[in-house]
């Protein structure tokens, strides 16, 4: 005599079959998601999704963190539901539960996230504040924009991201530190700020991949209120870092968080950076910091002397401002060097300053122009300067023209479009191609590399 109720047995068997069918369906859906979104996106967001159960037309999935749940719900849920319905018409909805995995980094994310955010960034330099920043025409827009971002609790429409660009030593990093200091010291706002270089962002990303803490990395960076990335040109050519930066950028913008980015050139001129990233970097306010004027350099020196509480004759300050034109770092370094002459009992005069800074002054006076580069390269290869501007594609002309473009990028502060215009109205893409060609030849052809080094000496 059987003690098993046939109806209960049949119901139990149906549930097993259904669960098995849905497990198979889920494996198929996972493959479809992988093919649909690609390896990087799948591994970043969808690989942690687990099938739990299904009943009464509802599928229950699980993820290890609340953050992943929210991201999937906003960005992928509609597609996942559609794929489920293609497999089983009875599925009406999907729910995601958060199930922390034991013995994994994801189980300690929420516990450590708050304190770890503070360890993400680089230390701030206490010297770099808005009060210590000398404003002039070349940096006025960048300063005003930076101050507005720092003082606003929420991102300002049209200023997110704030993108600052300019040559080395012109004040980009100073402004970024100033923004961070202002926010950190603001009594009214408790915003989490992270400032770091693009190089450190890449290093932390690689470390997270190696230690299998990638979800912790994602949560840390996506939980900040203000993310500031310095020298973003560093991610050029680094595909996986660019992919992660792209997703971090989008996540913060979607959450209405502020981004401040800096580079040594405008977004459109960032060679080796994906177009989709360059496009997003230009979404907000792009402010350039131009080369300093005499008046601005003199103002910087006067402010520095006041901070140092020391006396430097006005004619010496004017001499420095007139002759040290490369960047602010060199200008301040020159002032420090001249100031130290007083420690050995020498009087500070224009003559003593000129003697002390002989090498630096020589390099600053060596301002190389594109026209000079074209002339010297043309002479070296025994061609005409007009060949630099022509559209003739002879090999004997193309290579010297590319070399001249390469040196124009290396030795001048001109933008890529400006360089292209100086070579017969070519576009910036042509300049990029020329520079990459020369760089590749230098790496692969030792004789060519020697020739380039020989040419380089002509401009020193």
Swiss-Prot record:
Domain IV, binds dsDNA: annotated segments: 343-460
Q: Determine the domain of life of the protein's source.
A: Bacteria
**Principal subcellular localization:** cytoplasm
Q: Which family does it belong to?
A: Belongs to the DnaA family.
Residue numbers spanned by region Domain I, interacts with DnaA modulators:
1-91
Q: What is this protein called?
A: Chromosomal replication initiator protein DnaA
Q: What are the start and end residues of every segment in region (Domain III, AAA+ region)?
A: 123-342
Give the region (Domain II) as residue ranges: 91-122
**Molecular functions per Gene Ontology:** ATP binding; ATP hydrolysis activity; DNA replication origin binding; lipid binding
Described purpose of this protein according to its UniProt entry: Plays an essential role in the initiation and regulation of chromosomal replication. ATP-DnaA binds to the origin of replication (oriC) to initiate formation of the DNA replication initiation complex once per cell cycle. Binds the DnaA box (a 9 base pair repeat at the origin) and separates the double-stranded (ds)DNA. Forms a right-handed helical filament on oriC DNA; dsDNA binds to the exterior of the filament while single-stranded (ss)DNA is stabiized in the filament's interior.
Subcellular location per UniProt equals: Cytoplasm
For this protein, the record's Pfam families field holds: Bac_DnaA (PF00308), Bac_DnaA_C (PF08299), DnaA_N (PF11638)
Task: Give the keywords, sorted.
Answer: ATP-binding, Cytoplasm, DNA replication, DNA-binding, Lipid-binding, Nucleotide-binding
């Amino acid at each position: 005599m059987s003690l098993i109720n046939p109806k209960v047995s049949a119901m139990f068997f149906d549930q097993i079959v259904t669960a098995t069918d849905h497990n198979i369906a889920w494996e198929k859906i996972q493959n479809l998601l992988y093919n649909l979104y690609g390896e990087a996106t799948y591994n970043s967001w969808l690989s942690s999704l687990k099938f739990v159960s299904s009943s009464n037309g509802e599928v229950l999935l699980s993820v290890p963190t609340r953050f992943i749940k929210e991201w999937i719900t906003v960005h992928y849920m509609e597609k996942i539901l559609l794929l489920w319905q293609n497999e089983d018409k009875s599925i009406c909805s999907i729910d995601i539960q958060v199930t922390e995995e034991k013995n994994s980094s994801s189980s300690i994310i929420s516990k450590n996230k708050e304190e770890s955010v503070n360890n993400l960034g680089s230390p701030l330099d206490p010297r770099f504040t808005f009060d210590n920043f000398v404003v002039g025409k070349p940096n006025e827009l960048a300063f005003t924009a930076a101050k507005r971002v720092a003082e606003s609790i929420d991102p300002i429409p049209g200023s997110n991201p704030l993108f600052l660009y300019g040559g080395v030593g012109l004040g980009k990093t100073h402004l970024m530190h100033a923004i961070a200091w202002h926010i950190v010291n603001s009594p009214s706002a408790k915003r989490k700020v992270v400032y770091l270089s693009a190089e450190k962002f890449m290093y932390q990303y690689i470390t997270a991949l190696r230690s299998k803490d990638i979800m912790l990395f994602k949560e840390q960076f996506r939980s900040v209120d203000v993310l500031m990335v310095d020298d973003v040109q560093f991610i050029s050519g680094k595909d996986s870092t660019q992919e992660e930066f792209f997703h971090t950028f989008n996540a913060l913008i979607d959450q209405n968080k502020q981004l401040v980015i800096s580079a040594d050139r405008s977004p459109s001129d960032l060679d080796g950076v994906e177009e989709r990233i360059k496009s997003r970097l230009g979404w907000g306010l792009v402010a350039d910091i131009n080369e300093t004027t005499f008046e601005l350099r003199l103002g910087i020196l006067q402010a520095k002397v006041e901070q140092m509480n020391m006396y430097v004759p006005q004619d010496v300050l004017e001499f420095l401002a007139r002759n040290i034109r490369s960047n602010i770092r060199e200008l301040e370094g020159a002032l420090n060097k001249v100031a130290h002459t007083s420690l050995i009992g020498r009087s500070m005069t224009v003559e003593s300053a000129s003697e002390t800074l002989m090498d630096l002054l020589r390099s600053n006076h060596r301002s190389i122009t594109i026209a000079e580069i074209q002339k010297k390269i043309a002479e070296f290869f025994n061609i005409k300067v007009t060949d630099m501007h022509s559209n003739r594609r002879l090999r004997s002309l193309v290579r010297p023209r590319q070399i001249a473009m390469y040196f124009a990028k290396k030795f001048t502060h001109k933008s890529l479009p400006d360089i292209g215009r100086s070579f017969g109205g070519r576009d910036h893409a042509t300049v990029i191609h020329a520079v990459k060609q020369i760089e590749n030849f230098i790496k692969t052809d030792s004789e060519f590399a020697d020739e380039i080094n020989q040419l380089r000496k002509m401009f020193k």
